[in-house]
Amino acid sequence: MKLDIKKTFSNRSDRVKGIDFHPTEPWVLTTLYSGRVELWNYETQVEVRSIQVTETPVRAGKFIARKNWIIVGSDDFRIRVFNYNTGEKVVDFEAHPDYIRSIAVHPTKPYVLSGSDDLTVKLWNWENNWALEQTFEGHEHFVMCVAFNPKDPSTFASGCLDRTVKVWSLGQSTPNFTLTTGQERGVNYVDYYPLPDKPYMITASDDLTIKIWDYQTKSCVATLEGHMSNVSFAVFHPTLPIIISGSEDGTLKIWNSSTYKVEKTLNVGLERSWCIATHPTGRKNYIASGFDNGFTVLSLGNDEPTLSLDPVGKLVWSGGKNAAASDIFTAVIRGNEEVEQDEPLSLQTKELGSVDVFPQSLAHSPNGRFVTVVGDGEYVIYTALAWRNKAFGKCQDFVWGPDSNSYALIDETGQIKYYKNFKEVTSWSVPMHSAIDRLFSGALLGVKSDGFVYFFDWDNGTLVRRIDVNAKDVIWSDNGELVMIVNTNSNGDEASGYTLLFNKDAYLEAANNGNIDDSEGVDEAFDVLYELSESITSGKWVGDVFIFTTATNRLNYFVGGKTYNLAHYTKEMYLLGYLARDNKVYLADREVHVYGYEISLEVLEFQTLTLRGEIEEAIENVLPNVEGKDSLTKIARFLEGQEYYEEALNISPDQDQKFELALKVGQLTLARDLLTDESAEMKWRALGDASLQRFNFKLAVEAFTNAHDLESLFLLHSSFNNKEGLVTLAKDAERAGKFNLAFNAYWIAGDIQGAKDLLIKSQRFSEAAFLGSTYGLGDDAVNDIVTKWKENLILNGKNTVSERVCGAEGLPGSSSSGDAQPLIDLDSTPAPEQADENKEAEVEDSEFKESNSEAVEAEKKEEEAPQQQQSEQQPEQGEAVPEPVEEES
């Protein structure tokens, strides 16, 4: 049995005694020996909540998801309930006079069972204020485990160290029956088989054994041995045909529930194993186990169902909800099923029977006549209609050839064998020298080995090309020209896809000339076209279009190097295929609910022709057959992505897209016609920007006006000195509360009155007063502003400042006559041309003055000479005045 086991999350902590999964959230609950309870998100690996419950060990804990609770039982004899969203304690009561070992929650009723070292099991009702409904007595030692029967929740089983398992019914005080296990030591764990096909339960004991029981015949079906120490637990997996057991020897063992043989032994390095949980819905086959040094969450595979769809709509699958994994079912998709959008199809299901292996893959032959079931190292080929065995054998992997009469497989020795008409072709072989991991079907035989993919010719086994890629899947188009290789990253998750073109002619030419490298093949055989950076979970080719589902629950298609979304889903979906008869792709979820999504074949054909450079043919021959606005919109979006803007503009029925395309191609008038006055401001602004780029200023003004883009209008009006437009803009800006923009508009327009009124409106009285005085608004107007200024100062408690403010007579530009003269007269300010003339006049006047400078200077000196002489005779200030001296006679 192949199990893709991955460690999803592991955390070190104190000893984990109890563990449980939340049914819908990615949470795991752990109860610790230290008395703590921890809630972890195993997808983000972040602790959601931690609660210190008590100082004694907490041995049991469960989610009660429908109430948003967790319930725990501990060695202080108490049961506590917490709201896991808030951490608030809901209830706390003493449940037993001894340690509480196990807790079980009824799947539908408000009941909780608790098993204890006091030798009893008790039933509690949370809707009745956690009243004790019933006490079940009869065990002679510690009750280690209690479990409800999922097929009949009115009964439950209890496992005890007295080496018995008792089965009880709610409401009855005595057990229905007691199983004496025959195990040499006590029973640590008991669990029911979850599916309806087998009346089994399982027990784990300190005598190192695991026993499977038929509780109807009360007989032991099988005994499993292999652990080296006490077995702490053993459980049936809810979806896989396996049993998981854990022991104090530190290992987890995975057993085949059909053959009861060990398939895998795991040691995660966390010492002794104490507890187990399986995801209640089987999501990604999660299991979680608690150990001495922490806990781990493991994924035993993905959620992809095992199914196959043939070319005419016949579906075959194994397992499913409430069915064993080996059960095979079929249904026919007729294409006329009427369902609501996003609702599954109502299909008539028929059971074909069961197979002797655990089916790990189902595959129809290319024509749908045969179905292969592969699992447990075997393959069986059945006829699709009667489900009769056609061929069988041992294999590690199996793929169909290009026709329904040929196939290849990996045999027990690891060699590839080729069969034609159900007989081995002994003369056929492939030159492989390393271990083979997997085979891929298609136009060429794909072989995965050692991190490479090898492509071989089906006819003669010749190596066509070796490609260095760690492939998860290889998907070929129907015409054998295109191939999508789904790559995996280092974690084994889907990382990306590569679209390759197979050059068959180049390969045949090299083969004819004998130019094939033995280790690399033909270099020119494949060309890489595109890389698809998506997490691909499943995919199919429809023509040259690749349709696929993603890990983010999207249905997309990839064409021309671009990805387009078709639909979103709330859960993970897997692509079954495309039926041209219905124009639909079909998908299924993990429970094999089938969904259909309509897709236009004409749209795909149009895109295919366009990518081949035949766009004229696509427009002439295919486009007239395309119906519906959605299909035309998809084509227009595709053409836009391929930069066919003119063609997309002519085709698109979507007004928004046409507007965007009209801007791209410069058809501004068309873009204007597509808009209305009520259109979004963003579109008008985009039109305005495009108009500016093409110097269409008139259209730019109209667009910015409708967009209410005042800043852009200010740029335009000020650039063209449009005073009327600036005044209108200023008023609009003032109404919009954009006072700075409004003032600038008034200022550039020369509207001093408007600027003054705006300053007063915004209570900028000081600036308004100086503005009015400087630009000659009149003393009366200035005094009115000053009065308001003073009143505002007084109102704000600035009386001293108010007293110092003068009126118009103290401001620059005032006059005694009351008619203020402006210091700067905007109206009389000369224009640039007049200013140049004045400057020339000043130059001429300076030359005239310079020519007469000598005469002027001489005249000035004559006038200043006697004055200078007189001044020299006078003493300076502060100098002593000498006494007059008499002349000698």
Swiss-Prot record:
> Assembly and interactions?
Oligomeric complex that consists of at least the alpha, beta, beta', gamma, delta, epsilon and zeta subunits. Interacts with the ESCRT-0 subunit VPS27.
- In-chain residues carrying the UniProt-annotated modification Phosphoserine: S326
Q: Please note every region of biased composition (Basic and acidic residues).
A: 836-864
Quote the protein name from its UniProt record.
Coatomer subunit beta'
Which superkingdom is the protein from? Eukaryota
| GO biological process per UniProt | endoplasmic reticulum to Golgi vesicle-mediated transport; intra-Golgi vesicle-mediated transport; intracellular mRNA localization; intracellular protein transport; late endosome to vacuole transport via multivesicular body sorting pathway; retrograde vesicle-mediated transport, Golgi to endoplasmic reticulum
Task: Quote the function comment for this protein.
Answer: The coatomer is a cytosolic protein complex that binds to dilysine motifs and reversibly associates with Golgi non-clathrin-coated vesicles, which further mediate biosynthetic protein transport from the ER, via the Golgi up to the trans Golgi network. Coatomer complex is required for budding from Golgi membranes, and is essential for the retrograde Golgi-to-ER transport of dilysine-tagged proteins.
Residue ranges annotated as transmembrane are: none
Q: Which InterPro entries match?
A: Beta-prop_COPA/B_2nd, Coatomer_complex_subunit, COPB2, G-protein_beta_WD-40_rep, TPR_COPA_B, WD40/YVTN_repeat-like_dom_sf, WD40_repeat_dom_sf, WD40_rpt
Organism (species): Saccharomyces cerevisiae (strain ATCC 204508 / S288c) (Baker's yeast)
Sequence similarity: Belongs to the WD repeat COPB2 family.
Task: Keywords in alphabetical order, please.
Answer: Cytoplasm, Cytoplasmic vesicle, ER-Golgi transport, Golgi apparatus, Membrane, Phosphoprotein, Protein transport, Repeat, Transport, WD repeat
Please list where the region (Disordered) is annotated.
806-889
